[in-house]
């Protein structure tokens, strides 16, 4: 298993010669890492949040060299509105403030961990104090909160350019994990898969595995790691399309 660090996020320094770095350019870097540098002829990719965007681009541009991709699909809700607006519209203003105050940066990050995780009102049910301080310290000591924010602005500023016009756009076998805490309003977990299949977004993917879990929030690999790993394995091994909820498997008609 290979876990690359996203440029500008914590462990990975920003690339000074690539100020326009965004998710689809990161996909090119990761594909080069896997094939040219590490020598893999084929590989599989999984990710959440911005990592899910990278996986989607890999499955679009490099489908023939992937066993498949597995990702989280986020329902765009009002709880994410302030976060996205600030990152996209005023990244530098926000970055200066957060880079100047460790307490301010921790408060900004903590608010998202509290509100976006399925914690039942107790954040330490998901993240221990040590986890929280470790995550925040990685951003602080590397001074990378600003460069991480810039990625969101670049995703919007430099729009995605398709590599081909074939259908579906993401041709690699694709699995998706849904979690109850991010169900759209009025949609229960047992209806989540069907709700997605009836949406326009489903047509973007060569779907082979859709799984909905009652529990779990935005930070899926951290919150429900065992289920996430099981979902990945099914996607990369599944011989035929499947859908599952925590009530059990079902088969598309």
Model region roles, listed by residue range:
Residues 2, 46, 209:
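Conserved Rossmann-like nucleotide-binding pocket used by diverse enzymes
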Residues 89-253:
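C-terminal subdomain of alpha/beta-hydrolase-fold enzymes, centered on the catalytic histidine
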Residues 47-57:
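Glycine-rich nucleophile elbow surrounding the catalytic serine of serine-hydrolase chemistry
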């Amino acid at each position: 298993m290979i876990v690359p660090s996203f440029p500008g996020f914590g462990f990975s320094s920003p690339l000074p010669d690539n100020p326009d770095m965004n998710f689809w350019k990161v996909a090119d870097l990761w594909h080069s890492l896997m094939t040219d540098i590490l020598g893999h002829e084929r590989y599989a990719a999984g990710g959440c949040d911005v990592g899910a965007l990278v996986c989607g681009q890999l499955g679009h541009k490099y489908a023939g060299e992937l066993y498949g991709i597995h990702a989280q699909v986020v329902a765009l809700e009002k709880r994410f509105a302030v976060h996205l607006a600030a990152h996209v519209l005023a990244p530098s203003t926000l970055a200066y403030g957060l880079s100047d105050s460790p307490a301010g940066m921790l408060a900004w990050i903590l608010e998202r961990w509290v509100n976006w995780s399925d914690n039942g009102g107790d954040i330490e049910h998901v993240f221990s104090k040590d986890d929280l301080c470790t995550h925040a310290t990685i951003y602080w000591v590397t001074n990378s909160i600003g460069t991480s924010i810039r990625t969101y602005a670049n995703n919007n500023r430099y729009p995605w350019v398709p590599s081909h016009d074939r259908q579906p756009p993401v041709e690699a076998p694709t699995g998706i994990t849904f979690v109850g805490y991010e169900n759209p309003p009025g949609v229960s977990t047992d209806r989540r898969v069907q709700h997605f299949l009836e949406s326009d977004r489903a047509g973007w993917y060569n779907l082979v595995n859709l799984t909905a879990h009652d529990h779990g929030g935005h930070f899926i690999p951290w919150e429900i790691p065992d289920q996430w790993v099981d979902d990945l394995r099914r996607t990369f091994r599944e011989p035929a399309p499947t859908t599952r909820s925590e009530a059990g498997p079902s088969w598309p008609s």
